[in-house]
A protein has these predicted regions:
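Extracytoplasmic "Venus flytrap"
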Residues: 49-71, 95-101, 123, 189-197, ...
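Extracellular/periplasmic periplasmic-binding protein-like sensory domains
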Residues: 256-329, 396
Length: 397
């Protein structure tokens, strides 16, 4: 089994060579704490918390996974260099799952068997759901899943804490935007996986909740594939004013390009999981006019204290600013705040203390960005931005 211990801040993880070296275990050495070093009991002096993160470092969503990982690591490194959070250092063990739900579930089981204190930052709807299901008997804290299904937001699921808004929140924001423009002939293009089907269901429900006409059509395609011809043909027949996409960047780019080539002149709107940078790399100037949902502040929001802090640390690395990196940073900062609150409340940090601390974070002001770890349906719509991308890749609000 390959453990990735990410120590080196001076390299850019987004380069192909760097990614190859990471995956082949050449960088760094494995120096993991054993069970005796965990933070499950006792006072905080010299203690550490160990987190387990399964993330796609290869495969369909590797750009998203790497950026998210880098952002989280950047924050954890910064606090660890200052003797941790209230004296508690945070260590992250990372495994590549290649955007495979089966591998993510196996990785989650490995982490739990190794005795990590929480699962952190898993990426992908199917991966998050599978990891939760695989470890439900042990009920580990499951913090900041990236793109988990709305099923993991149910009030009776006490161990999952979501930093990002849900698919339902993004769907509601996008559909409401369409309504303000008088667009009531809406279709959905989605990938045939848990994320795509979940997003499709969320859009359909948002239309009901907003008392708008139902979808005029929907089409599914293989995950992150350019095999979209059947979907293009199906949706061109129903003549939608707007097409909402729940898909990764390759599928999204192929669908936009081929639908426009078929004569479509309507609006494309994307869920945040597509990633602005990956989609721009795939589409180039053809990205112009595409609308995207964003669940975290823009890297260009330099007037926001959170982003100023993020950019200050980023300047000390070779990493590139991105929405996904910011989201990882926010997740790490939110987890660290939970550690701080747990120590302040009990003088120690353990599972019960962390859970209580996270439950108290219903309106945490993180440098101008509000975090609610137990938000109800549609409560997080307020933090979502819709942005339009220009042909040269600039973001307009």
């Amino acid at each position: 089994m390959l453990w990735l211990l990410l120590f080196d801040d001076t390299e850019n993880f987004m380069t192909i060579d760097r990614r190859y070296f990471l995956i082949n275990g050449i960088v760094g050495t494995a120096c993991f704490a054993g069970p005796a070093a965990r933070a499950q009991s006792g006072k905080t002096g010299g203690r550490k918390i160990v987190l387990g993160q399964s993330v796609p470092l290869t495969g369909a969503a590797d750009q998203i996974g790497l950026a998210y990982l880098n952002g989280a690591k950047m924050y954890f490194d910064s606090v660890n260099q200052k003797n941790g959070v209230s004296g508690v250092k945070i260590e992250v063990r990372t495994l590549d799952d290649g955007y495979s739900a089966t591998k993510a579930a196996a990785n989650a089981t490995t982490f739990v068997n190794e005795g990590v204190d929480a699962l952190f930052g898993f990426v992908g709807t199917a991966s998050c759901d599978a990891a939760y299901a695989a470890t439900i008997a042990q009920a580990p804290l499951f913090f900041a899943p990236f793109g988990a299904s709305d099923a993991l937001r149910a009030p009776d699921i006490a161990s999952v804490f979501n930093v990002r808004p849900g698919l339902a929140d993004e769907a509601y924001k996008i559909v409401r935007h369409c309504a303000t423009l008088g667009q009531d002939r809406i279709a959905v293009f989605a990938e045939d996986d848990a994320m795509g089907r979940g997003g499709l269901a969320a859009v359909a429900q948002a239309l009901i909740d907003l008392k708008l006409p139902p979808l005029v059509g929907s089409a599914l395609s293989p995950v992150n594939s350019d095999k979209v011809d059947a979907a293009v043909a199906a949706l061109m027949k129903v003549q939608p004013q707007a097409i909402i996409q729940v898909s990764l960047f390759n599928s999204s780019a192929a669908f936009i390009r081929k639908t426009r080539a078929a004569g479509y002149g309507g609006q494309f709107l994307n869920f945040s999981v597509v990633g602005i940078d990956p989609l721009f790399s795939a589409l180039g100037k053809e990205i112009g006019g595409v609308v995207m949902s964003q669940v975290v502040p823009s890297p260009r929001s330099v007037g926001m204290p959170l982003i100023k802090e993020y950019l200050g640390l980023l300047d000390q690395t070779d990493h590139i600013a991105s929405y996904e990196s910011i989201e990882g940073y926010i997740a790490a900062r939110a987890f660290s705040e939970g550690v701080r609150r747990s120590v302040a409340d009990t003088g120690k940090v353990d599972r019960g203390g962390l859970k209580k601390a996270f439950e108290s974070m219903s309106d945490y002001n993180m440098g101008g960005f509000r975090v609610n770890l137990k938000a109800k349906k549609y409560e997080s719509v307020r933090v979502i931005d819709l942005v339009t991308i220009t042909p040269d890749g600039k973001v307009l609000r």
